[in-house]
């Protein structure tokens, strides 16, 4: 039995309490996204810049757009004027480019650093060791036009909840170690298949798509 978009969002909101919900809009029609918007949802996320810019033109102006996919440096300029949060900053080269484009647009762009916590090699992100060195060197403070709000991570794509929770717990522990020094407020963990486990492990923001539209 399929549920309506409104019913699915209502159920998710009841499950997650005060955790921030960002709706992943990839592969979805404008009609479907408007149904989500009508539930007072304003935070939407895309994996690809081309889709993000296209949907921004077609959707209401008060939507807060998040970038959650692997971002090429040559595409940053297309989203720099308006992006609400780039959650997938996975390398210093990209951080430099975001800072440069933010400066051109006379703004400060909020970001999360993506941390590689999964067993799969194809997932992107900094290692925790690399990040610890970056934070200890205070390198981040050089980037005046980005605001680092916290971390993002993706668990291994598995049905083994023990593995998922172990990876999320590892990231939560790293987040807690640095959050006071770095003034972090956001820990983005959890998608359609694992957001319950992510919240149990301290996530403050979840990225949900297919669970809403099923």
Language-model region placement:
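Conserved alpha/beta-domain cores
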Residues: 1-193, 199-201
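Gly/Pro- and small hydrophobic-enriched strand-loop and loop-to-helix capping segments
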Residues: 203-214
């Amino acid at each position: 039995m399929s549920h309506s978009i409104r019913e699915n969002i209502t159920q998710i909101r009841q499950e997650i309490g005060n955790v921030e919900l960002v709706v992943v809009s990839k592969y979805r029609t404008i009609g479907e996204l408007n149904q989500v918007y009508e539930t007072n949802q304003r935070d939407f996320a895309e994996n690809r810049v081309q889709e993000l810019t296209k949907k921004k033109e077609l959707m209401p102006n008060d939507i807060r757009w998040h970038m959650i996919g692997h971002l090429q440096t040559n595409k940053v300029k297309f989203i720099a004027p308006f992006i609400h949060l780039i959650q997938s900053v996975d390398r210093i080269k990209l951080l430099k480019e975001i800072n440069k484009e933010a400066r051109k647009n006379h703004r400060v762009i909020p970001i999360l650093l993506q941390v590689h916590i999964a067993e799969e090699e194809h997932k992107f992100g900094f290692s925790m060791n690399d990040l610890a060195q970056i934070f200890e060197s205070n390198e981040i403070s050089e980037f005046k036009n980005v605001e680092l709000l916290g971390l993002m991570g993706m668990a291994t794509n598995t049905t083994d909840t023990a593995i998922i929770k172990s990876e999320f717990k590892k990231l939560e522990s790293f987040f807690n170690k640095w959050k006071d020094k770095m003034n972090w407020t956001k820990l983005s963990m959890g998608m359609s298949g694992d957001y319950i486990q992510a919240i149990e492990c301290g996530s403050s923001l979840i990225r949900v798509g297919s669970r809403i539209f099923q």
